[in-house]
């Protein structure tokens, strides 16, 4: 029996948007961030879903813009003593688990993730205990405590390959927390997967009929879909994949127009990869319904320039990620399994 958190009835309060900044104010904060990064031996690690100006700043200062797997690798390999993680809290936790000797700062510790929020440790632990014969695989979008309960951690970029491997070993799987990604992986591999019923507030909003209408306006466009989207949306795709995989698909597909069903923060790097192509955001509303996320994670949007300055200036307290030693050691086991497995795929 599936453990079911009724996501559709769970309305997470969205955080306030960062204050509007003038062009001169943005320039002031960018220059200040550059100075602070140098002074503190810090490097920026930013996710594809952060705002374009944050991604550009990470690139300009020698940092990294990537998906959660590459963010983890970069932070693990970079010599800087401080990591400034521009993303959501589980990404900061992962960085700290992999780099306990480093100081890990975030613009705000209030940058949540609906997948993380929708998979509480207590309920998930009980779910796993109820199915002791299953191998527990959790998505990177989970808390350190949930990772500590898992056998494996996985990102969307290697999800199909990992589950295919475990299935070949005769393993039955508990998958958490994203039900859409879990169902997609089950369909791709045929594995015996029991899904936790979470969802991403951004990808869960993509609508089939609205996407069909946009495709009708651009019949020569390819449709790119992240597998956290509903299956009916995935069924319309010309390419399905993680953020990094979608960027590669944007480059390799012959189409000059691309309709993209993932967080629109990805457009910054995708347009860099194929500047000659037109990108269109897949609709997140339809049939008279308005969108809540409107194809951009509200928590990713909290990573503004002012917040980054505050994080670097204030350091601890509201900005530093701390993970208890025992919890870190438990969560490190499935994370290292993921990194070792991913390394074998290269």
UniProtKB/Swiss-Prot annotation:
One family name in Pfam for this protein: NadA
Biological process annotations from GO: 'de novo' NAD biosynthetic process from L-aspartate
Ligand binding (iminosuccinate): 47, 68, 139-141, 156, 226-228, 243
Ligand binding ([4Fe-4S] cluster): 113, 200, 297
Record keyword ATP-binding present: no
Cofactor note: Binds 1 [4Fe-4S] cluster per subunit.
Broad class of the protein's primary localization: cytoplasm
Coiled coil: none
A GO term, aspect molecular function: 4 iron, 4 sulfur cluster binding
Catalytic activity as recorded in UniProt: iminosuccinate + dihydroxyacetone phosphate = quinolinate + phosphate + 2 H2O + H(+)
HAMAP family found in the cross-reference section: NadA_type1
Protein name: Quinolinate synthase
């Amino acid at each position: 029996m599936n453990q079911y958190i009724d996501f559709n009835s769970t309305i997470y309060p969205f955080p306030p948007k960062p204050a509007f900044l003038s062009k001169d104010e943005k320039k002031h904060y960018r220059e200040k961030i550059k100075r602070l990064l140098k002074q503190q031996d810090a490097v920026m690690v930013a996710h594809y879903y952060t705002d374009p100006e944050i991604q550009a700043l990470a690139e300009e200062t020698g940092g990294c813009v990537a998906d959660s797997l590459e963010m983890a690798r970069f932070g693990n390999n970079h010599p800087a003593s401080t990591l400034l993680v521009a993303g959501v809290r589980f990404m900061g936790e992962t960085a700290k688990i992999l780099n306990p000797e480093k100081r890990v700062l975030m613009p705000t510790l209030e940058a949540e993730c609906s997948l993380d929020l929708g998979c509480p440790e207590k309920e998930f632990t009980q779910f796993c205990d109820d199915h002791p014969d299953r191998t527990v695989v959790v998505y990177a979008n989970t808390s350190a405590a949930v990772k500590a309960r898992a056998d494996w951690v996985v990102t969307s970029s290697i999800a199909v390959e990992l589950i295919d491997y475990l299935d070949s070993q005769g393993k039955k799987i508990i998958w958490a927390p994203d039900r859409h990604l879990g169902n997609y992986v089950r369909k791709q591999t045929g594995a015996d997967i029991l899904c936790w019923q979470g969802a991403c507030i951004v990808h869960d909003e993509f609508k089939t009929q609205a996407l069909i209408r946009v495709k009708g306006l651009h019949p020569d466009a390819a449709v790119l879909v992240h597998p956290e989207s509903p299956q009916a949306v995935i069924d319309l795709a010309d390419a399905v994949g993680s953020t990094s995989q979608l960027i590669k698909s944007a480059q390799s597909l012959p189409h000059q127009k691309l309709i993209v069903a993932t967080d629109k923060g990805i457009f910054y790097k995708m347009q860099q990869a194929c500047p000659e192509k037109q990108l269109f955001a897949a609709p997140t509303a339809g049939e008279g319904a308005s969108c809540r996320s409107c194809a951009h994670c509200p928590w990713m949007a909290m990573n503004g320039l002012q917040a980054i300055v505050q994080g670097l200036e204030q350091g601890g307290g509201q900005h530093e990620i701390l993970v208890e030693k025992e919890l870190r050691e438990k969560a490190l086991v499935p994370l290292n399994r993921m990194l070792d497995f991913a390394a074998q795929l290269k």
